[in-house]
Amino acid sequence: AIPAMFYACKKDTYTTKPQISIKSISSKNISQGDVLLFSIDFTDKEGDIQDTLWVQKISRICPTTPGAQFIQANRVPDFTATSNLKGTLEIGYGYNANVQGYSTISGCGTRNDTCYFKFWLKDKANNVSDTISSENIVLLK
């Protein structure tokens, strides 16, 4: 599930294609059992972002290790669309742990995994944002 915080704004600079940016990352060094949390800011002219936030994890160290990389579709919570919508989506992952409310991610197993995440947002009218990438994140073995 993706928690969402949003509010309407009177600016005319919003576009039909959703705009996203990374507001924050909980940590760049994650120990096993920790939650990695991303806050993604968004704007949308029509406010119809209630479709899908896509996430891709890319390992720089062990790309062929099963489970070290993935692409995941995450449903954005349904709400009443408001023009010129601005807000924050939060998505998190439990690292090698079953944490209620979060998907689980894994790393390289026997060594640290340096990875990064890509995000893109699709709205109800099938408009897709640009793809954004996180900084490197280290999943400690």
Feature map (PLM): residue ranges:
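C-terminal motif of bacterial Sec signal peptides marking the signal peptidase cleavage site
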Residues: 5-8
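Bacterial signal peptide processing site
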Residues: 10-12
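First exposed extracellular module after export/assembly in secreted or surface-exposed proteins
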Residues: 17-141
